[in-house]
Amino acid sequence: MRTEIADALLRAVLPPWAVGAARADDVSGPLFAVERALCEGAGPRREGEFTTGRWCAHRALVRLGGSPVAVGRGPRGEPLWPPGVLGSITHCPGFRGAALCRAGPARALGIDAEVDAPLPARVRDRLISTDEAGRMRPEVAGERLLFSAKEAAYKACSALVGDGRVPRLAELRILVEPGRHGPGTSGRFRVRVPALTVDLDGRHFEGRWKRSHGLVLTSCVILRPGTEVPRAWRPGTEVPTAQG
C-alpha cells in the first residue's frame, strides 16, 4: 500500500477539523533523543511500530500547522502531545497512523486500526455483547468493526479520566448506524458509556469507521458539551471554545 493511500484511509475516518498521517511500511527514523530512549531494548517489530508511529505523529504535527517535536510517553503508555493538541497513535500489521486536532470543541481524540478479520471467539465472547453483534450480522467480520470502535473510544476516554475511571472495553456499547457494513463501506457510530462514569457522556461521542484494503479504521472524538463544532478550521489556528 502506498503512503498516499494509507493517508487517505485515515483521513476518511477523521472529522474535517482533524489531521492525520499514515503509512503501511516501517521507517527507521528520524527520532528525537527522548523518543529513541523510549524504544531502547525493544525488538525489531516493536521498534518499527514505535518509530513509524512517531514519524506519523511528526508529520501530522506539521499538517496541523506546527513543527515536529518529541512525542513522549505518559504513565499509561499514552503519547504526550504539545499543549493545546489532542491526538492518538495506532498500528496494526500493514498500517501505522497518527491523528491530531486542536483542543477546543474537542476534548479527546482516539483512533484505531485493525486487520479486517474475524475476532477470536474468546475475545468476541468477552468484549462484544449479543445485542451489539446482532446488529452487525450477516456482515463478515462485523465484530472486528465493533472491537475497533471500542478501542478508539477507550483511547479517547483514557485521555480524560484516570485509569480507575476508564470504562472497560466490554462496558462501552457501540451502536453502528444502519446501512451496509461490509468491506468497502464506511459510516458513523455512537457510544454508550456506563451511567456512573464521571465526566463522560455518550451523547458527546462522535465516531467514524471505514472498511477498506483489508483493514478496519475507526476514530472517536469526545466533544465539549454546549460547543458548536465547526465543519473545518484552518490548521495552525486556534479554534473557538464554549464561553462560560
Go through the PLM ranges and name each one:
Residues 1-244:
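Core catalytic alpha/beta fold that binds nucleotide/phospho-ligands
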